[in-house]
Amino acid sequence: MSNHAVANRYAVALFELAQEKGLHESFVSELELIKAVFQDTPELMQFLTHPKTELTQKRELLEKTFKGKVNDTIFNTLVVLVERKRIDLIIPVVQKFKSLSYDAQKIAEAFVYSAKPLSEAEKDQLSVLFAKKVGKAKLLIENIVDPSIIGGLKIRIGDRIYDGSIKGQLDVLHRELVSGPRS
């Protein structure tokens, strides 16, 4: 079975437990914390995946790092991943869990590229407008400042891209001038 399929199974199981307990939001935030710890501390993953490290040492490190800081269900999932030598799947598990949780709540993540930072009011307006377009109740907007787009906005929601940036328009104009207009 591929790692992707295995990660999905762990995420679905964790999601179902979160649903039973009504803890979607807290699970998402705790899993994001775990993801950040693993991304910021590559040595942690190296230690937990090293074949010569004893399982008891791995458990002790997990307890020191996460016990009492995350829900017991999440902690137990980490222990199972370590015991089954699957801890390297933690980031895909977190991403899939987050996706399942957001889908259940009709939430989508949107990455908005702009030449300057957006105000909260602008983010709220974009959230309302584009949430309707993609059939979601709410968009969680992450603003990425990219001066290279010159002006306007470029929005990525899932696999959809809405490019209203000046750079995007200049790129289209350049292509048309080089190869002729599209029919």
From Swiss-Prot:
Per its UniProt record, what HAMAP family does this chain match? ATP_synth_delta_bact
Quote a single Gene Ontology cellular component term. Answer: proton-transporting ATP synthase complex
Name of the protein in its database record: ATP synthase subunit delta
> Can you state the subunit structure given in the record?
F-type ATPases have 2 components, F(1) - the catalytic core - and F(0) - the membrane proton channel. F(1) has five subunits: alpha(3), beta(3), gamma(1), delta(1), epsilon(1). F(0) has three main subunits: a(1), b(2) and c(10-14). The alpha and beta chains form an alternating ring which encloses part of the gamma chain. F(1) is attached to F(0) by a central stalk formed by the gamma and epsilon chains, while a peripheral stalk is formed by the delta and b chains.
Query: Where does the record say this protein resides?
Result: Cell membrane
Gene for this chain? atpH
**How does this chain sit within the bilayer?**
Peripheral membrane protein
Q: Which Pfam families match?
A: OSCP
